[in-house]
């Protein structure tokens, strides 16, 4: 067979094929130097790790499971309204213990917790808040800045785009995407 065979095993009940090395970025990455085939079990938050593997080595068969630990493609990267609502809410509290109150805040704002954590990291990066020992304090003197100035925000936007491709693209689109040079 010429080229590469691509298999979609993204379904919940799909079983991993036996005897084929498994790329699981939540653990140790296997040595693939002599492998003709590979199973992509999990997707790293930084897709360049996966791209590097694919561009370095030619596989004749690829099985895409594509489990995503933190599904930012489902939460999005935070709308202007969500950021505004978060700011208005935390502005009312001089100190906010995010170790114990994060879940309540997520529920109150109706924002998934994984996204809320990123949004708070963006605020911290931009100097809107400081976090010390799990306590978040609003910097009321912070100069006005655009959310887009944040590197964390830019990375999150890219992660959402990459995850959408890995979760929703066809196996051919995914393979082509992984083979694209940056």
Indicate where each model-derived feature is located.
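Structural alpha-beta junctions
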Residues: 2-6, 33-34, 52-63, 110
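A short, well-structured beta->alpha microelement
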Residues: 2-34
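Long, low-complexity, charged/polar intrinsically disordered regions in eukaryotic proteins
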Residues: 39-76
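Short amphipathic alpha-helical interface segments
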Residues: 77-103, 107
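Short amphipathic alpha-helical interaction segments
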Residues: 110-125
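A short, conserved structural fragment
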Residues: 124-135
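Minor-groove-contacting beta-hairpin "wing" of winged helix-turn-helix DNA-binding domains
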Residues: 135-141
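Short, amphipathic alpha-helical interaction segments positioned at domain boundaries
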Residues: 142-182
């Amino acid at each position: 067979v010429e080229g590469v065979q691509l298999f979609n095993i993204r379904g919940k009940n799909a079983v991993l094929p036996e005897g084929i090395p498994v790329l699981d970025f939540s653990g140790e990455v296997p040595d693939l130097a002599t492998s003709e085939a590979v199973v992509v079990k999990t997707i790293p938050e930084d897709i360049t790790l996966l791209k590097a593997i694919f561009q370095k080595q030619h596989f004749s068969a690829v099985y895409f499971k594509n489990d995503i630990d933190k599904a930012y493609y489902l939460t999005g990267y935070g709308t202007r309204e969500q950021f505004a609502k978060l700011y208005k809410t935390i502005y009312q509290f001089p100190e906010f213990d995010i170790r114990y109150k994060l879940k309540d805040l997520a529920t109150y704002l109706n924002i998934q917790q994984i996204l809320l954590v990123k949004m708070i990291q963006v605020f911290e990066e931009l100097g809107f808040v400081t976090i010390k020992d799990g306590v978040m304090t609003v910097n009321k003197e912070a100069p006005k800045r655009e959310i887009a100035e944040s590197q964390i925000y830019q990375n999150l936007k890219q992660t959402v785009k990459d995850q959408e491709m890995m979760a929703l693209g066809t196996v051919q689109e995914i393979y082509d995407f992984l083979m694209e040079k940056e």
